[in-house]
Regions:
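Alpha-helix boundary/N-cap detector
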Residues: 7, 15, 19, 39, ...
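DNA-recognition alpha helix
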Residues: 28-29, 160-169
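The feature captures two recurrent sequence modes
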Residues: 66-73, 77, 141, 145-160
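Charge-enriched amphipathic alpha-helical scaffolds
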Residues: 89-99, 169-198, 285-289
């Protein structure tokens, strides 16, 4: 990872000044900010600017491990600097809710992340406790496993998602807590969209499309192709799924496809055949073994 000089003096007022009332309300909803809905635009802008620093700790609790690691790096490099990493191209809750700013460096094929000086001290105050909290380990592992599954399949219905993520022996959690954790990463910006579909017996089924699946969106648009992807669930080993889930974190730590191949072999005991079957391009996070 590299750093460079950047303008980190921008404020939340700068970020929200050009937004509509509905856009600010959407951000407040995503971050679970306690802001009254019946406010005028100027009043809402003032309220959200004060609410974000005050409730940033609650928001950070919902983030994936690699997002917290990215924030940690942005805090450590200090004021006036940006962090440059190989392009992630993800719909991170950090970006979607304007906690960090991102610029795509086309010539360097990298993303340039900046964190406002206004938010840095608030994040620095609560981030270490979250990163080092032993009680977060089940949640972090659940998130990692979920990233792996959605990288491989693209769409999950709620029941299958629960079965695949929690009740497969990966994590020993009681059902209510498992459902709570599942909802936490659904609401965290991890999923790009949620839609309800009516199946033949008249019951409604929820499908969640991963934010990491940009290159598979054309495939997911076709019902038959999506069913085929989900049907392939049993074709993948736990190691493959976990490796896919670990990929966003790996991209922050290393640069280059060959290094990634070595990591897959060493850390996840993937065979040469499995590694060769890994399809990767710079526009996506994660690999899709299709």
């Amino acid at each position: 990872m590299q750093t460079r000089q950047a303008n980190t003096a921008y404020t939340l007022a700068d970020v929200f000044r050009g937004m509509t009332l509905s856009e600010m309300q959407a951000t407040a909803y995503d971050m679970s900010l306690p802001i009254p809905s019946k406010l005028r635009k100027a009043e809402y802008q003032e309220a959200i600017i004060h609410a974000i620093p005050e409730h940033i700790g609650d928001f950070l609790l919902r983030l994936a491990r690699y997002e917290l690691e990215l924030l940690d790096q942005l805090v450590l490099i200090g004021s006036g600097k940006a962090l440059i990493v190989p392009t992630l191209s993800i719909n991170s809750a950090l970006i979607a809710n304007h906690i960090i700013q991102v610029e795509f460096l086309r010539n360097e094929h990298a993303d340039c992340f900046t964190l406002s000086d206004e938010l840095r001290p608030h994040i620095a105050q609560c981030l270490p406790a979250i990163l080092n909290d032993p009680d977060r380990k089940p949640f972090d592992r659940l998130m990692q496993y979920a990233f792996g599954i959605t990288n491989l399949y693209g769409a999950l219905d709620y029941k299958k998602g629960m079965d695949m993520i929690v009740f497969r022996g990966m994590i020993d959690l009681d059902k209510p807590k498992a459902r709570l954790l599942f909802k936490r990463f659904i609401n965290s910006g991890f999923f790009l969209q949620c839609s309800q579909e009516t199946i033949q017996n008249g019951k409604e089924n929820q499908y969640f499309t991963s934010a990491l699946m940009y290159e598979l969106e054309p495939v997911l648009a076709e019902t038959k192709a999506r069913k085929k992807l989900v049907k392939r669930y049993n074709d993948f080993s736990d190691e493959e799924i976990l490796a896919a889930g670990e990929f966003p974190y790996i991209r922050l730590m290393c640069d280059g496809y060959e290094e990634l191949r070595k990591l897959l072999r060493a850390e996840f005991r993937m065979s040469d055949e499995q590694v060769r079957g890994t399809r990767y391009d710079s526009k996506s996070v994660g690999f899709i073994a299709i």
